[in-house]
UniProtKB/Swiss-Prot annotation:
This is Protamine. One of its GO terms (biological process) is chromosome condensation. Residues 1-32 are annotated as: Disordered. Testis. The keyword Nucleus applies. One of its GO terms (molecular function) is DNA binding. GO terms for cellular component: nucleosome; nucleus. It comes from Oryzias latipes. Keywords: Chromosome, Developmental protein, Differentiation, DNA condensation, DNA-binding, Nucleosome core, Nucleus, Spermatogenesis. It is found in: Nucleus; Chromosome.
């Protein structure tokens, strides 16, 4: 149970972090 809950939680956190990084990188390029 702990391994199954950690797998989806880590995948969702990685996806959210990737989206934030991509948006921050796009804003930085547009501001430059």
């Amino acid at each position: 149970m702990r391994r199954q809950a950690s797998l989806p939680a880590r995948r969702r956190r990685r996806v959210r972090r990737t989206r934030v990084v991509r948006r921050r990188r796009r804003v930085g390029r547009r501001r430059h």
